[in-house]
């Protein structure tokens, strides 16, 4: 997502596929959505030399993630950033009922997940358009 929580790219993946592999596939497919010099915020699960090399060398982006205990401090405490990222997930799960999608087939899950992401994007876009102070707030649309 963008800083305001606008969905940029997404996919559904088998739960046994690692986060780094999924993110690599998304970025290879949607490489035109990132620009050299951009920062990607992620959690500790994205630690890995090969993945970070892909981001830096192939895409020219910088990965910022919490430091693992076995590595030197690089970016300091990122608790506020983590809270900010989790707030986007909370919006999807809470207000948009992402976890109670009701899809019974892979196609149904895909369609209903897409509906929720589109609803979030429409709300953020509308808030941008009207100049709302908080772009990700969906309270005005929560009927």
Predicted regions and their residues:
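Active-site beta-loop-alpha junctions of metal-dependent nucleic acid enzymes
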Residues: 11-32, 39
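Charged alpha-helix within mobile-element recombinases
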Residues: 92, 109-122
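Short, acidic, Ser/Thr-enriched surface-loop or helix-capping motifs
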Residues: 2
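Helix-centered, glycine/charged polyanion-binding patches within enzymatic domains
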Residues: 35-108
